[in-house]
Amino acid sequence: MGSSFGHLFRISTFGESHGGGVGVVIDGCPPRLEISEAEIQFELDRRRPGQSKITTPRKEADQCEILSGVVDGKTLDTPIAIVVRNKDQRSQDYSEMQVAYRPSHADATYDAKYGIRAVAGGGRSSARETIGRVAAGAIAKKLLREIAGVEIVGYVKRIKDLEGQIDPETVTLEQVESTIVRCPDEAIAPQMIDLIEAIGREGDSLGGVVECVARRVPRGLGEPVFDKLEADLAKACMSLPATKGFEIGSGFAGTEMTGSEHNDAFYTDEQGQIRTRTNRSGGTQGGISNGENIVIRVAFKPTATIRKEQETVTNSGEATTLAARGRHDPCVLPRAVPMVEAMVALVLCDHLLRQQAQCSWW
């Protein structure tokens, strides 16, 4: 199973949704970076369940514990192990899923591949696996800020057909966190909340889009041809549960433009830096960061596990129906924001270290 990610800044996540706990081991973090459990906890609190009326009611504090790699608040350049204990499992809610597959969930494919699966909570296919990613992402964010001043802000761009109007150049974390749906558009956010609540009462679910911007990313990050920066960002974000699409810059909308309309014209700013007047490229050209803001969008499907009765089959192929009894998000988008931010941070941190290792000699 592919549970590791990265080259120089490398993470390996572990644990199942209803096991003893989940966590991450981080290898390659440089020494003497100041980091605390409180800084990691801040990010984990943004993704934890039970945080609002529009998220899963599963009650988990998701309290992190640093087991190794940090002494007196500073990293040692040794593996950093972080664990979060599971506290609020209700495995009996998954008894029907022992034999019946959830439509559009990983149950059937895990069985087909491995011949065995952790039924309760979905095991490694559960969003609880992302706890390790978000914890590692907190460290990557801190390293990026300290070394290069990079700032990463994600937010909910769209839920179903409700789309917020947000400027990625100016949006702030405070604006994002001012509403439980994490959409900083004050006009559309209440409508999103009402829609999620209504769909949740029906036992159904919703999908949408998270947009994320990384500001002040240094030029030169990315390794053509197969490790292009946008390719690694796409892989990282598409490895998150429930993802179904990825865009950078103009994305698919760029196919409706001509070259002269789409090209980002160069100019030299007052500081003598080469810039672009527009940013349809989304901060990369030729797979390498160009110094402009990196702007990506990630599409998340509606949550597969719903209370509505659905047609399915058992693991022996017999027709049956299934209505889930577990506690699940009616919409993953509000909790997905810190997950997307974490994956962007992990990719940028890894490429920053690779760039310094490869090109800092000259």
Curated annotation (Swiss-Prot):
Catalytic activity field: 5-O-(1-carboxyvinyl)-3-phosphoshikimate = chorismate + phosphate
Disulfide bonds: none
Cofactor note: Reduced FMN (FMNH(2)).
GO molecular function: chorismate synthase activity; FMN binding
Origin: domain of life: Bacteria
Cofactor: FMNH2
Record keywords, A-Z: Amino-acid biosynthesis, Aromatic amino acid biosynthesis, FAD, Flavoprotein, FMN, Lyase, NADP
Residues binding NADP(+), per UniProt: R47
EC annotation from Swiss-Prot or TrEMBL: 4.2.3.5
Residues reported in the UniProt entry to bind FMN: R124, S125, S126, G286, K301, P302, T303, A304, T305, R327
GO cellular component: cytosol
Enzyme class: lyase
Pathways per UniProt: Metabolic intermediate biosynthesis; chorismate biosynthesis; chorismate from D-erythrose 4-phosphate and phosphoenolpyruvate: step 7/7
Biological process annotations from GO: amino acid biosynthetic process; aromatic amino acid family biosynthetic process; chorismate biosynthetic process
UniProt-listed InterPro entries: Chorismate_synth, Chorismate_synth_AroC_sf, Chorismate_synthase_CS
Matches recorded under PANTHER family: CHORISMATE SYNTHASE (PTHR21085:SF0)
Family annotation (NCBIfam families): aroC (TIGR00033), PRK05382.1 (NF003793)
Family note: Belongs to the chorismate synthase family.
Function: This reaction introduces a second double bond into the aromatic ring system.
Summary of subunit composition and partner proteins: Homotetramer.
Protein's name according to its UniProt entry: Chorismate synthase
Species of the source: Synechococcus sp. (strain ATCC 27144 / PCC 6301 / SAUG 1402/1)
